[in-house]
Amino acid sequence: MGRQRERSRPVRRDGEGMREAIRHIDSLERLKEWDAADLVNRANAIGNELSRRRMTTSQIRNFLDEVNRIHAETQGRGAEFDSSRVILLKPLLAYSAGHETNREKQEVLKSFANLFSAAADKVQDASNFKHFVDFTRAVVAYHRFYGGSNQ
């Protein structure tokens, strides 16, 4: 009976939550069209997945730190938003994935890079960037909630 119940549950393959989120992001014209409840639900699933796949807190925090730096610069001085700063996060993500020598960890970093590259492509202005920041912070929070660590 217990084995039967396990089989009836849908099995999610590694990376499936991120692939689903990428498909959803690709369907949006702008990131700000993303419903907040759906954004949080997807961030929850992705944070859990990243934790299970052993992405370290330092790897995810490095990206968040850069996102927060851009956010602070655009908020602090009333500076005009420059979307090229967000697009330039993509090479940072690629470097992080390419730098990893462990194949399993490299795969999760590539999935992470693909996810946030898709999101970065939808950031044209400050209001879209706010959704990008919210999504990034939510993924980081859920990663930590599900036990993401530095090991």
What do the predicted segments below correspond to?
Residues Q151:
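Charged, terminal alpha-helix-loop-beta segments
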Residues G15, R19-L109:
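The feature represents the first ordered module of a protein
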Residues M1-R23:
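Intrinsically disordered, low-complexity arginine-rich tails of RNA-binding/processing proteins
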Residues K110-G148:
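Amphipathic alpha-helical binding modules
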